[in-house]
Swiss-Prot record:
This is Chorismate synthase. The keyword Amino-acid biosynthesis applies. Reduced FMN (FMNH(2)). The lineage of its organism: Bacteria, Pseudomonadati, Thermodesulfobacteriota, Syntrophobacteria, Syntrophobacterales. GO terms for cellular component: cytosol. GO terms for molecular function: chorismate synthase activity; FMN binding. It comes from the Bacteria.
Length: 351
């Protein structure tokens, strides 16, 4: 199976399955001399971890171990290998799915492509794989922090509910990573309603990056916004991405969408911090549309591996929504893209 690596200069390869012994990531290209301890990675993993009140009850501690690439608390420039052991695997919950295709999942497409599939929670296609991405993103965060770049993701829509205000300090005060406390409370009530109904929901995650210098990105086929979109679309539950004004720009006039230039910089940021594929120096802003979790207890129609009709009600430990756990995953993917581009040739300074 190809496709488990991401990045060019700051390059990662994730490995492992949802119900295997462990999962992890190898990071190649991280510069030497960056202070890095397990606690730096653990903080981000805690934000994604299952077993919390509004997420899957699967009780994974997600303790990371650094196997290589760090000596005396700093990176050495050699490949960094991180491992997270699976501690709460219950493959028996999935036995009845061995011969049934789950609607909305990759069961059938994996089998059509490879002739075999891991039915224990989806194997590589499981959201559990994203723990490795978050671990890698934490390393990228340490690298970028030394260059003044800060990346933050948060929920702006959930099950049809939208934020009406933005308080950056509120993001880490609620389980949805939502900048609007009132909206977060409504989201929590909605989770309980959907859980009782045996259904699920999606939402929208926004990611913003502050402190990015102008000049990141390459023209034509390696544009910064193209790489950001591809990175976010690689997350399993993401079905759409927009940068800056995004799809709203289609309804604007040119005079409304253009970001006027002033002696002090840009007067607005409809471009989302990227023009012609190259960063402008403004905040980079991207949004990801997240689909509902397909594993629901509400009865659904499907077929088994013999093509026979089946009514399926999925049991097991599942989230009502990929939000909030997908929020740090989207954050990690943007961190990885920016770290990669920061290692490209530096922008030419104006003389």
């Amino acid at each position: 199976m190809a496709g488990s690596s991401f990045g060019r200069l700051f390059r990662i390869t994730t490995w492992g399955e949802s119900h295997g012994p462990a999962l992890g990531v190898v990071i190649d290209g991280c510069p030497p001399g960056i202070p890095l301890a397990p606690e730096d990675i653990q903080r981000d993993l805690e934000r994604r971890r299952p077993g919390k009140r509004l997420t899957s009850p699967r009780g994974e501690p997600d303790r990371v171990e650094i196997l290589s690439g760090v000596f005396q608390g700093v990176t050495t420039g050699t490949p960094i290998s991180l491992v997270i052991f699976n501690r709460d695997v219950r493959s028996g919950d999935y036995t009845e799915l061995a011969e049934v295709y789950r609607p909305g999942h990759g069961d059938r497409t994996y089998e059509q492509k490879y002739g075999v599939r891991d039915w224990r929670g989806g194997g590589r296609s499981s959201g559990r794989e994203t723990a490795a991405r978050v671990a890698a993103g934490a390393v990228a965060r340490k690298f970028l922090a030394g260059r003044g770049v800060e990346v933050k993701a948060y929920t702006v829509a959930f099950a049809g509910l939208h934020v009406d205000s933005f308080n950056r300090d509120e993001i880490d005060r609620n389980p949805f990573f939502c900048p609007d406390a009132t909206a977060a409370a409504a989201m929590e009530r909605r989770v309980e309603e959907l859980r009782d109904a045996g259904d699920s929901c999606g939402g929208v995650v926004e990611v913003s990056a502050r402190g990015c210098p102008a000049g990141l990105g390459e023209p034509v086929f390696d544009k910064l916004d193209a790489r950001l979109a591809g990175a976010l679309m690689s997350v399993g539950a993401v079905k759409g991405v927009e940068i800056g004004a995004g799809f709203a720009a289609a309804a604007m006039l040119g005079s409304e969408n253009n970001d006027p230039l002033t002696p002090d910089g840009y007067a607005s940021n409809n471009a989302g911090g990227v023009l012609a594929g190259i960063s402008t120096g403004m905040d980079i802003v991207a949004r990801a549309a997240v689909k509902p979790i397909p594993s629901i207890s509400k009865p659904q129609q499907t077929v088994n591996t013999r093509g026979e009709p089946v009514t399926l009600s999925i049991k097991g430990r599942h989230d009502v929504s990929a939000i909030p756990r997908i929020v740090p995953v989207c954050e990690a993917m943007v961190l990885l893209v920016l770290a990669d581009f920061m290692l490209h040739p530096a922008p030419v300074e104006k003389r």
